[in-house]
Amino acid sequence: MRLFRQLSIQWKITILSFGIVAFALMMVSISLLGYVTSIKEDELSNRTMITAQLVAQNHTVQQWVDAKPEEASRTLQPIVERIRVINDHDYIVLLNMDRIRITHPIPERLQTPFVGGDEDPAFAEHIYLSKAKTEGVVTVRAFMPILNQQREQVGVAVVGSVLPSYADMIQEFWQPALLIGLITALFGFWGSWLLASHIKRQTFNMEPDELAHLLVERDASFNAIHEGVVAINKHEKITIMNEAARRMLGVKEKAIGRNIHEVIPDTKLPEILSIGKPLYQREFYIQGRLVFSNRIPIQIDGETVGAIAIFQDKSDVDRLAEELTGVQAFVDALRVQNHEYSNKLHTIAGLIQLDEGKKALQYIFDLEEEQEEFSGVVMQKIHNDSLAGLLLGKVSRGKELGVQVIIEKDSEFIDHPEGVTTHDLVVIVGNLIDNSLDAFSSTQDQNKTVHVFIGEENDFLKIRVRDNGEGIREEVREKMFVRGFSTKSTSGRGIGLFLIQAIVERVEGKIEVESELNIGTTFSIYLPKKRG
């Protein structure tokens, strides 16, 4: 046993597999031996019965079997012996009605009483087979009544054949059986070795103790990672879940080996198995915490055999958070507003120097009315300081670019939809307005307008941004939501629509895009007030 434990896994598998093959071969051989013996017995039984019928129907036998025993034996013994030899039976015995042997292969037993104990039914004209063990062998015997021409019973024909034993069958078939056994054993050993070699290659030629050590190292490495890591196999069973993932997902019970839907009901990791492509920086909420995930398929030889997800907390991705909050957009808005009011102050100062005080005062009133009209819509209808500030900044930015950004008067924002944060709204509105402003970069039209609507429609918060810019070409529409795709050559572009789509998908909303070249584009975002 100690020697067996010291063998490599390849030799262990080979020996075990070959042992199973050898055991199966032995069981099959025993079963086959019994089956062949049974067939042989059936064959002998049929032959014995046919011969008994042939003897009983012989006219000479019918005429002489009830004669005097001495005369009957002299007449019938040669005839019956010839039939016995030809048909290869061990004995044929004819009995008269006094149960005296008229014929027998052993002459000393002629004219002696039959001793068997199973012949009574035959003297009542019954036809049957029986088995008897005599002198250490088992014989099958056919009993056939002998009837004369008047259909009267005059005797009984008994035909017996010795049944072959298992030893006889082995002796008869040992040569072909040995040849088949050797060939089977050879192929069994060869197949076992191939199987063991295949398993060895599948385990990267590593022994079980090496695999166990590697598994321990892997678990330690994953648990040392600050990000949450979850991996599944192609059957959607969890194979990896480190401690960080347990904390983020709030999982306390055993997770390894369970279906991921049982542990994380709203998971989207299994979809990676079907699409076979990675998804980066997708956001969603876990236990009230906004996280980002990278989901990557695990592929071997081009086949997807699993998927792995890496979760990152929002606080760990400051760079992406800065893109979401639109800090740069507010800085630009302040710069534009400073420049705009500087020009207005210069105008007022000039009117005062020209002693046009009434005109200066009227100019101030006009500015105040214009500002109140615009600010009234934004500040009174948009009950979110960050979103209102963003809209004011975008209006100012539009003026700098010669584009009129119009906040529609029927806009109204009161409360966030379920699962949508202020950052999400800033990302959606800010990027849509920026895209509309960019749509005028190559147009010479003087009437450049962008209409923005934010309000409730049925059970959705609707965000609509409509411009009369250059429109979107068909080839661009097919790829505009892909991360990194942009029609601009500026570095860092191509993330806005990708982020919008990620937010909308997370809250199970929808995006509608209508665009015609040289006419304009309309983006409509629908965010459900309540999910589910």
Curated annotation (Swiss-Prot):
Q: Which domain of life is it from?
A: Bacteria
Where does this polypeptide localize?
A: Cell membrane
Q: Which SMART domains match?
A: HATPase_c, PAS
Q: Which InterPro entries match?
A: HATPase_C_sf (IPR036890), His_kinase_dom (IPR005467), PAS (IPR000014), PAS-like_dom_sf (IPR035965), PAS_fold (IPR013767), sCache_3 (IPR033463), Sensor-like_sf (IPR029151), Sig_transdc_His_kin-like_C (IPR004358)
SUPFAM superfamilies with a match to the protein in the record: ATPase domain of HSP90 chaperone/DNA topoisomerase II/histidine kinase, PYP-like sensor domain (PAS domain), Sensory domain-like, Sporulation response regulatory protein Spo0B
Q: Kindly state which reaction or reactions the protein catalyses.
A: ATP + protein L-histidine = ADP + protein N-phospho-L-histidine
Q: Name one GO molecular function term.
A: phosphorelay sensor kinase activity
* Membrane-related topology note: Multi-pass membrane protein
Q: Name one GO cellular component term.
A: plasma membrane
Q: Which UniProt keywords apply?
A: ATP-binding, Cell membrane, Kinase, Membrane, Nucleotide-binding, Phosphoprotein, Transferase, Transmembrane, Transmembrane helix, Two-component regulatory system
Membrane-spanning segments: 13-33, 176-196
Residues forming the PAS domain are 216-279
> What does the entry give for GO biological process?
regulation of DNA-templated transcription
Please give the residue ranges for the topological domain Extracellular: 34-175
Pfam families in the cross-refs: HATPase_c, PAS, sCache_3_2, SPOB_a
| Residues with the Phosphohistidine modification | H339
Classification via PROSITE patterns: HIS_KIN (PS50109)
Limits of the Histidine kinase domain: 315-531
The EC number of this protein is 2.7.13.3
Residue ranges that the UniProt entry lists as topological domain Cytoplasmic: 1-12, 197-532
Where is the major localization of this protein? Answer: membrane
**According to its UniProt entry, what is the function of this protein?**
Member of the two-component regulatory system DctS/DctR. Probably activates DctR by phosphorylation. Essential for expression of dctP.
Protein name per its UniProtKB record: Probable C4-dicarboxylate sensor kinase
